Amino acid sequence: MMNKKLKIVIVGGGTAGWFSAGYLIKKIKDCEITLIESPGIPKIGVGESITPHIASFFAEMGIKTKDWMYNTGAIYKFANKFVGWREGLDAEEEHFSFSFTADNSSLYKEPPEVTDQKLWPESDVSRTTDILIKMYNDGEIDKFDQYFNSQYHYMKKNVAPFNGTEYMLNPLWSWSQHINAEKAGDYIRDTVAIPSGVKHIQQKVTRVVYKDNTQVDELILENNEKITGDLFIDASGFHRLIVKQLGWKEKIYDCAPVRSAWVCQLDYEDHEKEMVNYTQSIAKPHGWMFKIGLWHRMGTGYCYAPDYISDQDALDEYMQMIDNRRMEPRNIKWTPSRLEKMGQGNVVAIGLSAGFVEPMEANALYIIMNTIRRLCEVIWDRKSNNEFNFDTFNEKISYSIDDIADFIKVHYTLSSRTDTKFWRDMREIGIKEKHEEMLLQKYNDPRNSMASTTKGWSLFPDYMWAQLAIAWGIDTK
């Protein structure tokens, strides 16, 4: 029986750090949490397109949607609008919605229980997507996303069914948001974490004292203070302040071509026209551009493949994309990767420390949220001597990030664009690696079922793989 408080130490004061602190202090009984934040470290945050999971994550901390949206400059989002990813379409057909949710989850009938992670067996149980794909293949419907996602029409008209008294969306509908990720972390810090007893230390970590590469004894701060704990969380972003010193191995996604971005925040020139209720993902000669509207401004960025274009040329292209508006662009570089194991011994990595592929498809905050939720399960199941079993945790988080990497990859490799060497090379990779066949495998993988996504296996349920196939013009017969 555990009779002493669990001491949790978090390194990193960004979104991952404060999300972890706020959620764990609410969900873990008898714990003490210390968050160490190095002053002066810039945070990565331009504007974040999120998935519906984040709103429920906030609700589990006792935060009302109205409150956090107001305090983070958030707006509602119905879909992701893709432009220019397919050749040969006229102006009206060149874009399509890509929904992360349906308005009524009871539409889904789950296939039989499968435990060995093989593909679904033949059965008489049909998913809604099975029926709609058959209708699409038979020519009975011609716009899969419009039939499958009724919220498509709200995106198209930039309108929403509001409850006028609260100025909130009608709760009969499911939705997501655009959020200022940096403000969200600060909001959790000020309204949940610190008021609930999280200790905040603003000091630089200079040394990690450890027994072996999985067991940390203490952290030494710049002022020589020693911080001990039972569980250490590395939420230090790309710096990986703890796990890098421990020498943890990482898996590199060699197939991920986009590894750099120019980003900036833009003021609206025409607020009513530019603030739209969908994420804009616009294919460009050497990558893609995002536009994410917030209430007070817009986050933009050009995510590009540095093997095909120089930083300066990419900046020049980016300036043209935003009509040479006055701005202060930042260049961000990363290695698409994840740790081979996100949790070992008494150490766990969360957020960018754990892994990052690229900004596409609103995955960054999802990975943070999913990792924190799964960590709670590990803590609840710990032994009396505070030994943590990360086996299932690592399996789920690893699959989740790998699945995100695959989903993003086929956006490029199954695109019909051929206007630059970048896009032609991507198509060759897709053909060589048989990515069309992979779509069917993903659609039929039990870990991508609706039930499995709620258990932390995948961000992208089976129906999103179906939407991707149809939207990219893949033969689904």
Predicted regions and their residues:
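N-terminal Rossmann-like FAD-binding beta1-loop-alpha1 element of flavoenzymes
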Residues: 6-31
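Glycine-rich FAD pyrophosphate-binding loop
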Residues: 25-46
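Long, low-complexity C-terminal extensions of enzymes
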Residues: 377-477
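Conserved FAD/dinucleotide-binding core of flavoprotein oxidoreductases
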Residues: 283-335, 355-366, 378, 386
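Predominantly flavin-linked oxidoreductase catalytic cores and closely associated redox partners
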Residues: 167-314, 372
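Dinucleotide-binding Rossmann-like beta1-alpha1 core, especially the glycine-rich loop
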Residues: 46-153
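Conserved mid-domain beta->alpha element of the FAD-binding
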Residues: 337-401
